Curated annotation (Swiss-Prot):
GTP hydrolase that promotes the GTP-dependent binding of aminoacyl-tRNA to the A-site of ribosomes during protein biosynthesis. This is Elongation factor Tu. It comes from Lactobacillus gasseri (strain ATCC 33323 / DSM 20243 / BCRC 14619 / CIP 102991 / JCM 1131 / KCTC 3163 / NCIMB 11718 / NCTC 13722 / AM63). The gene is tuf. Keywords: Cytoplasm, Elongation factor, GTP-binding, Hydrolase, Magnesium, Metal-binding, Nucleotide-binding, Protein biosynthesis. It catalyses: GTP + H2O = GDP + phosphate + H(+). GO terms for molecular function: GTP binding; GTPase activity; translation elongation factor activity.
Amino acid sequence: MAEKEHYERTKPHVNIGTIGHVDHGKTTLTAAITTVLAEDGLAQAEDYSQIDAAPEEKERGITINTAHVEYETKNRHYAHMDAPGHADYIKNMITGAAQMDGAILVVAATDGPMPQTREHILLARQVGVKYIVVFLNKVDLVDDPELIDLVEMEVRDLLTEYDYPGDDVPVIRGSALKALQGDPEQQDVIRKLMETVDEYIPTPERDTDKPFLMPVEDVFTITGRGTVASGRIDRGTVKVGDEVEIVGLTDKVEKSTVTGLEMFHKTLDLGEAGDNVGVLLRGIDRDQVERGQVLAAPGSIQTHKKFKGQVYILNKDEGGRHTPFFSDYRPQFYFHTTDVTGKIELPEGTEMVMPGDNVEFTVELIKPVAIEKGTKFTIREGGKTVGAGQVTEILD
């Protein structure tokens, strides 16, 4: 059995992805980046067909094809997401399967911005992708430089329309295909693109630096010691002596102090984002904490019942509904670790939502849940997933 390579944390890690209209060159650019960086000893070259034949992944009950490639620049380690089909992009961005810190928007100079260009920018804005770098592709196929200037202006205007700093966004012009074919001038353009990404997209705050949050999956009692809540730490860190709040499913917030921490039946000094832990809570009875609540750093998250969500609705081939739904539809919303019934109100002008649609609507839950902008959820009906989304705005 070959030994697994150890992941060395020497450079800061950033998640990015390519977005843009079909056939504008997203996958070609992804291949070009790995090829050029491989020449510089910073990546393994991935060819177009490897990236395009993306494996299927299940994310919260939804099948998505996504290609993940990794590479390094002089300063950073990147995980780069590329998805073959338009529907895969939508699902990827909405379900948060690929949490992007920044994106490279690919626009073909031959076409200019197209419908999916707009849709991807809107989605990037909705799901909190704060930084976009533009790659104007296929510039070798446009004879008139003024046309390229025009396309750049259109892209900048479109970004401004969706609250990105259109005037300041970096725009790199080149030909991904030529770079992939080994044209030295275009390979330098790819290097310049990656230097720009390095500089323009800031290193994200690490999950461990954020306030502590752990969705409760299970609760049990240790005789003589008290109540233990277990789950996977979503963000932040926790140690013995920390004060925590138990939030959700009721308007009352219980306060407690962590008196013990264990992982894999061993005591633990510090639990951090990603760890599955059991947290022993001082002065809390078995009935004061339940699955579906969260343990959180005091004051860091509140309960809400009403919110707007950006949602992808599964089509019937994906195991979703066979029929549309209307306002007042009442499915279960699965947040953190539990289902809560909610009533959907569609936006004005939207009569109904068809399977396969991507839509923003308002939800009113029957119980308060610990949520904030960016919280992920799935929509379920009779135990099967019919949609997935995330909170875009809190309304109460």
